[in-house]
Amino acid sequence: MELKKLLECLTFYNVNGEVENCEITSLEMDSRKITSGSAFVCITGFTVDGHDYVDQAVKNGASAIFTSKPLMKEYGVPIIQVEDTNRALAMLAVKYYDYPTKHFPLIGVTGTNGKTTVTYLLDKIFEYHQKKAGVIGTIQVKIGEETFPIVNTTPNALELQKTFHVMREKDVKQGIMEVSSHALDMGRVYGCDYDIAVFTNLSQDHLDYHQDIQDYLRAKSLLFAQLGNGYDSEKEKYAIINDDDSSSHLLKRSTAQHVITYSCKKEATIMAKDIELTASGIRFKLHSPLGNITIQSRLMGMFNVYNMLAASAAAIASKVPLNVIQQALESIEGVNGRFEPIVEGQNYSVIVDFAHTPDSLENVLQTIKDFAKRNVYVVVGCGGDRDRKKRPLMAEVALNYADHAVFTSDNPRTEDPQAILDDMTAELDANSGSYEVVVDRKEGIAKAIQSAQKDDIVLIAGKGHETYQIIGHTKYDFDDRDVARNAIKQKGE
């Protein structure tokens, strides 16, 4: 694409150099990936500043450089200065890949907990509706039956638009994606033409990045504020909002589009009534403007009633018939790393779950306590280089519900694992409950499983689907499910 044409997507910028006859063959934010004809966009990250790598980019063949601050020397290629290269990158990527989300409807799901499950449920619903879906989520990118690994809940703007471009080429008819508060705040999803925005819930998380819970909510609300800012004003847009969450009033005010509410407690557009929670699943009646259906699901817990309501509301807004929604939801056996049972013939239960916030941990433990026959053990930690304020809260929740807690490492990253555990236990005393601290996660899981007797339940929380543990800057192979299976087998020997 000609640089001159690419620049049409930017409103304000300064150019130093000649843009005529400059052909751009790729967009890159990593100087190591630059080849002849690439445009290099300098992104200032948490630890690395792309402006420090302009020399390397030009040496590798960059044809143009996008910056957010003046450069100290000439490079012989056009230098385009913008106010914010993060937001500029998003718009450049959308333009370069020819506005891919114009070509299929897109659902964005945001909230502290439940995003992955809701996108999974929606994928299954559209599969039953015989509509090929592309999903971008915490676990993976899924296009039809193909899956690809993923690093962030929401990829950077460049990878995101590239993925949408691939979806378009593979004839995807419905896009579904998790949208993180980081991505919204950094402008990674600028230019994404959302048709439906879904809000699950809000509780404390990511306060290492956001100033406070209000700033976190503000970031989430951007998804709803951007509804209707797309390319086709004739298309109806919908905001799907959990009306039982205390933040719902602000999110309703954040959008000028149609609002669909869902609730388990009060009158709403979509409601769950006659809810039955058992050790084998969930049963409830879904009430909607299109009629009522009964859902019998193998998923567990009240939190999954909300997840199914959110997915159903988005599906109804997408014109999916109620009977298709019912069939799809009743077919689902579970979600990878979400309340996932580990069964090796043992006479006690082991469950792996991604719960890594105080609210999600409480939801899962409350569900377990509702059907537990004997003792409940929980293995849990907190991530390093992340919100320190939630650490004592995680320990408090664990001891409020479990008969015994094993506090252990999660992904310590660059922090001292023992220091993280000290933060978790700092406010505990002799009356707080039964717990032990085991720094090594493998040992912690093994200890809990060794302690379990007939009809006990062991919850291994925090990492869920993850197949790694981050220590320092290195990712090591580590899967809670595999570690649990091995511990169960060793106990039985």
Swiss-Prot record:
One of its GO terms (molecular function) is UDP-N-acetylmuramoylalanyl-D-glutamate-2,6-diaminopimelate ligase activity. GO terms for biological process: cell division; cell wall organization; peptidoglycan biosynthetic process; regulation of cell shape. Its cofactor is Mg(2+). ATP binds at G111, T112, N113, G114, K115, T116, T117. It is found in: Cytoplasm. The keyword Cell division applies. It is an enzyme of class 6 (ligase). It comes from the Bacteria. Keywords: ATP-binding, Cell cycle, Cell division, Cell shape, Cell wall biogenesis/degradation, Cytoplasm, Ligase, Magnesium, Nucleotide-binding, Peptidoglycan synthesis. Meso-2,6-diaminopimelate binds at R386, D410, N411, P412, R413, G462, E466. Pfam families: Mur_ligase (PF01225), Mur_ligase_C (PF02875), Mur_ligase_M (PF08245). A motif (Meso-diaminopimelate recognition motif) lies at residues 410-413. InterPro entries: Mur-like_cat_sf, Mur_ligase_C, Mur_ligase_C_dom_sf, Mur_ligase_cen, Mur_ligase_N, MurE/MurF_N, UDP-N-AcMur-Glu-dNH2Pim_ligase. Belongs to the MurCDEF family. MurE subfamily. Catalyzes the addition of meso-diaminopimelic acid to the nucleotide precursor UDP-N-acetylmuramoyl-L-alanyl-D-glutamate (UMAG) in the biosynthesis of bacterial cell-wall peptidoglycan. This is UDP-N-acetylmuramoyl-L-alanyl-D-glutamate--2,6-diaminopimelate ligase. It comes from Oceanobacillus iheyensis (strain DSM 14371 / CIP 107618 / JCM 11309 / KCTC 3954 / HTE831). The gene is murE1.
